[in-house]
Design a protein with these regions (language model features):
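Active-site region of PLP-dependent enzymes
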Residues: 184-190, 197-317
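N-terminal "arm"/small-domain region of PLP-dependent enzymes with the aminotransferase-like
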Residues: 1-53, 402-404, 458, 463
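Phosphate-binding glycine-rich loop
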Residues: 50-101, 115-119, 125-127, 192
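Conserved small-domain helix->loop->beta segment predominantly found in fold-type I
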Residues: 245-259, 290-361, 434-444
Length: 463
């Protein structure tokens, strides 16, 4: 791979009055990109007049399900209205019931942990591997109890988790593995697509995702016909609705109404045909950026084990205090200062999650269904303490992310300018380290805002 050399520029930081590394006219390209093919797919549905259907055989939705199952390599796929619904339906289809425990990594999007709550199951958190940012298999076994029913394995930012070790532990204890591949479309683990390894698996089609629809959407994959049938029932009122024939309106299960619509399905089908080419270009663009960043020892770029591929949904960059002449305990202040410097240069360096999931108030305050599921008979009400997850805390403190800017195939020139910005920041490391050493700093999770119940009133009108 050819590494593009940085453009000639002043070494004065923008935060000190210098020129930006990233020209303002070189903005982030809209995502998802919408091609003429995508527009034609949507127009096809509009002309048909079939926007949704009670039938499980609706053409666009069923077509998306077939095509995604083929892409991932599973026997079955069930489409739903969003990624969080996909996870709730998948857990329900896997047999998770009230009072069961579901293991979730301490670092993920909130939906990974609230999905079990909607089934009255108890989320149990496990720390992450600080290199892959995924659930740490070494910490997994200690979290398993006789009540553990499932493990939600998140492929965070697009990198597959260590599935061999996780599935071996799960099989030994008779626990169901559910892949949360919301950020990992197209990523592979030892030659297999993510979403084909667990017993039942989920994807998100939110507009921010690598495979995006025009709004929200979710996909569930499995090789188990019974699980797929149960997912279909949970998707639509608990009914077993035939592809053809009359609807009986008999609810066999307590289900939801989370079926997608045909317009979003058609748009996603079109986007899917373009996904492999976009993945290849993204790999090239991101590889060039990370290749340049790797030359600066103060920035730790994502590591990809040789047995897997990365979808590059989010780029998480850690900082190394020692390379700036600082002690480890100054990682947080250093990250904060570097983040500000990069943003001044035009790089959208932002956090992803401000606190570990177990620090979220919905868990610490037991804000489920009137204190349930924690108050169910026989449930062990474990404390949720951020300090129990040191790797997660460290990663949140010493890293920032780049999101969305790199997804568009034409983002290469923009990412080259981002690399210029990182170089300029590195060249000014002594000045930035001096600022970090005297910065008054409090970690995100200690200052995350908490809205008192009395402050909720009027929040809608204040938007």
């Amino acid at each position: 791979m050819t590494i593009q050399q940085p453009a000639r520029q002043t070494t004065d930081l923008a935060m000190f009055g210098g020129d930006r590394s990233v020209p303002r006219e070189l903005g982030i390209r809209p995502w998802p990109m919408v091609t003429g093919q995508d527009e034609q797919a949507v127009h096809r549905v509009l002309r048909s007049g079939r926007f949704t259907s009670a039938s499980s055989g609706e053409q666009e939705i069923a077509g998306l399900e077939r095509e995604w199952a083929r892409f991932v390599g599973t026997e079955h796929c069930v489409a739903v209205s969003n990624g969080t619904a996909a996870l709730s339906v998948a857990l329900g289809a896997a047999g998770v019931e009230p009072g069961d425990e579901v293991i979730v990594p301490a670092l993920s999007f909130i939906g990974s942990a609230t999905a079990p709550l909607h089934l009255m199951a108890v989320p149990v958190f496990v720390d992450i591997d600080p290199v892959t940012f995924n659930l740490d298999p070494a910490a997994l076994e200690a979290a398993i109890t006789s009540r553990t029913k499932a493990i939600v394995v998140v492929h965070l930012h697009g990198l597959p988790a260590d599935m061999d070790r996780i599935t071996e532990i799960a099989a030994r204890h008779g626990i169901t593995v559910v892949e949360d591949a919301a950020q990992a479309h197209g990523a592979r683990y030892r030659g297999r697509s993510v979403g084909s390894i667990g017993a039942v698996n989920t994807f998100s089609l939110n507009v921010s995702k690598n495979l995006a629809t025009c709004g929200e959407g979710g996909l569930i994959t499995t090789d188990d016909a019974d699980v797929a049938t149960r997912a279909l029932m949970l998707r639509q009122f608990g009914e077993l609705i035939p592809a053809r024939g009359e609807r009986s309106y008999v609810a066999h299960l307590l289900g939801w109404n989370c079926k997608p619509n045909a317009i979003q399905a058609a748009f996603t089908r079109s986007r899917l045909t373009q996904l492999p080419a976009e993945m290849a270009v993204r790999e090239e663009n991101v590889g060039r950026l990370l290749g340049r960043l790797a030359a600066y020892p103060g920035f730790l770029v994502p590591q990809v084990p040789q047995d897997r591929t990365h979808a590059w949904h989010i780029l998480r960059i850690r900082v190394e205090p020692a390379a700036f002449g600082l002690a480890d305990e100054l990682a947080g202040p250093l990250r904060s200062v570097l983040q500000r410097a990069l943003r001044a240069e035009g790089v959208p360096a932002v956090p992803y999650q401000l606190q570990p999931l177990p620090a979220q108030r919905v868990f610490t305050g037991r804000r489920g269904f009137g204190g349930y599921p924690w108050a169910l008979p026989g449930v062990v009400d474990r404390p949720y303490r951020p300090g129990d997850f040191p790797a997660t805390l460290r990663v949140l403190d010493d890293s920032f992310t780049i999101q969305k800017a790199h997804l568009h195939p034409d983002s290469g020139p923009l990412l080259d300018r981002y690399a210029d910005a990182f170089e300029k920041v590195w060249l000014n490391r002594e000045a930035l380290a001096a600022i970090a050493a005297t910065t008054d700093y409090t970690p995100h999770w200690e200052r995350a805002s908490e809205i008192a119940d009395t402050e909720w009133a009027g929040a809608f009108d204040a938007r």
